[in-house]
Amino acid sequence: IQCCLVGSEMCIRDSFHASSRAGDEPTDMTIGPFNLSIVEPMRSCRITVTENDTGWSGELLFEGRTSNIEEPRHTFGRGIRKVMDTTRFTQLGRWGGWLEFHGQRYEFDRDVTLGTKDRSWGIRPLAGGDRRGAPALPQAGGLFFLWAPLHFDDFCAHYQLFEDTKGRTLFSVGALLPVYDSIDALPGVEDPTVTHCRNLEHQLAFASDSRMIESVELAMTEIESGKRISIDFEKIFTFRMKGIGYSHPEW
């Protein structure tokens, strides 16, 4: 869990990590003080952290505002070694509840706290990845990744794009999703009225002498109508991904 609170003069970021060997019962998602429980499958879930020596505690309830969107299977490798082989789905919705850390309690109103939830399974390059066999060769080049689950008043958008170092698309998924006022109104695991998109495009504007992005234009084209959808972004603050665990020096 990572909490990033942005105010007018400061930004507080704190993370809670927990891990253990998976047990025999797949529905038991308890790791020490952490618990993830499914309230209604593919609609709502609850995260609970009981009091522990990290100073973290809290309870958050997620409720879907959209149905789920399945992302394409992601596979990457170096030589004969698989670095990533995952399946994932994403759902956009509301979060409500509270978190407490550093002796400060923060309340989250579900009516104004919009966010996302994704679940993935498989091999991921965390904690060094798969250590079996000979050491992996140094990685040549890199990977370009854009992921944007977006909330608007009357719809949500999902934009995901992986490219290689030459700008060639590896994986992509684009969709415009209807929104619903309650989880009871969700039409099912997936929504048959979702507008699927292709031809994902991006235009990034970088700060001078920096790799920091200042503004972005994302675009995609509706498959059935051919209509091009363009969304513009301006930078508000910087989010540090390593706090979650990606390429973290210790976690």
Label each PLM-derived region with a short phrase.
Residues 29-145, 152:
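Intrinsically disordered, low-complexity linker/loop segments enriched in Gly/Pro
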Residues 13-30, 175-190:
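Compact, glycine/acidic-enriched structural inserts
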Residues 1-7, 11-12:
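Single conserved hydrophobic/aromatic residue that forms the stacking wall/gate
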Residues 46-79, 168-251:
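Acidic/His-leaning functional-site neighborhoods
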Residues 18-22, 27-40, 204-209:
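Short, exposed beta-strand/loop patches in secreted or surface proteins that constitute
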Residues 113-194, 206:
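Extended soluble regions of mature proteins
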Residues 7, 20-25, 62-67, 110-121, ...:
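A short, sequence-level motif marking secondary-structure junctions
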